[in-house]
């Protein structure tokens, strides 16, 4: 399987595109219309909520998410991403912080531009948005999960820093923690035999030969680079032995192996 690890902000969501703020009064009607027109089983109205009192600050974060995808993702950029996926047969693996909204919700958002069908049903480990706020027990479980995961990420980051030191004389040349998230995911998903990561963060240390730097959005040159990288099926991609610790395996047994998300 070919995987495209997708960041969103700075890749398909340009920081200069803020058109959603011109349409705040339309958010509720937009979510109702999308639910009806797309008819994909996702309730945008329920996801976004219906509260708005005329003050832009009262609109929910999820209403802004829907509007950002609808108003601010440039069609030409979406088509560049689609061209990579159609040409290579790759699936989207969300590496963006947006994945914390939950994969079900992200599929709904991607569907606004017809991209939901490309989404792989797993993502690098994160705590699903909203899942553990239902009662005191689940809130406690969420806190435990976050604590355990932070310790594992710190262990991975420390060893990855040692394995992939950056040039201290260059800006932003060091190892980025997102690289560790992707590498841990690849280690478990041996079905992936080709991958590329599109990101506005520097993921070159640890993803050598599989990273395309993007900012503020995907350009034609980066489309060609991504397609070329995905043409080389050189996987699977195991973690370095030094990272395969008992602590990592215990964390996976506790939080990952029984999950349907990771």
Give residue ranges: language-model regions.
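Non-catalytic pre-domain segments flanking phosphatase-related domains
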Residues: 1-8, 16-19, 248, 254-262
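Alpha-helical substrate-recognition element adjacent to the catalytic core
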Residues: 3-137, 143
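C-terminal cap/substrate-recognition subdomain and adjoining C-terminal extension
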Residues: 105-262
């Amino acid at each position: 399987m070919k995987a495209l690890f997708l960041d969103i902000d700075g890749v398909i969501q340009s920081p200069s595109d803020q058109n959603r703020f011109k349409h705040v009064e339309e958010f509720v009607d937009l979510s109702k219309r999308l639910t009806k027109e797309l008819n994909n089983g996702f309730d945008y109205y329920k996801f976004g909520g219906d509260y708005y009192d005329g003050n832009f600050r009262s609109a929910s974060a999820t209403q802004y998410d829907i509007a950002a995808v609808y108003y601010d993702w440039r069609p030409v950029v979406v088509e560049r991403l689609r061209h990579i996926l159609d040409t290579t047969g790759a699936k989207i693996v969300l590496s963006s912080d947006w994945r914390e909204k939950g994969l079900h919700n992200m599929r709904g958002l991607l569907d606004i531009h017809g991209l939901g069908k490309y989404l792989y049903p797993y993502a690098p480990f994160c705590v699903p948005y909203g899942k553990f706020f239902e009662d005191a027990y689940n809130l406690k479980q969420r806190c435990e999960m976050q604590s355990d995961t932070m310790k594992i990420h710190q262990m991975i980051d420390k060893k990855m820093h040692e394995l992939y030191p950056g040039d201290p004389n260059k800006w932003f040349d060091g190892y980025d923690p997102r690289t560790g998230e992707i590498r841990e995911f690849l280690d478990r998903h041996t079905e992936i035999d080709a991958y590329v990561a599109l990101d506005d963060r520097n993921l070159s240390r640890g993803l050598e030969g599989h990273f395309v730097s993007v900012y503020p959005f995907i350009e034609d040159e980066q489309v060609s680079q991504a397609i070329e990288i995905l043409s080389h099926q050189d996987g699977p991609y195991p973690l370095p032995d030094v990272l395969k610790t008992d602590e990592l395996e215990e964390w996976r047994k506790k939080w990952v192996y029984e999950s349907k998300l990771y």
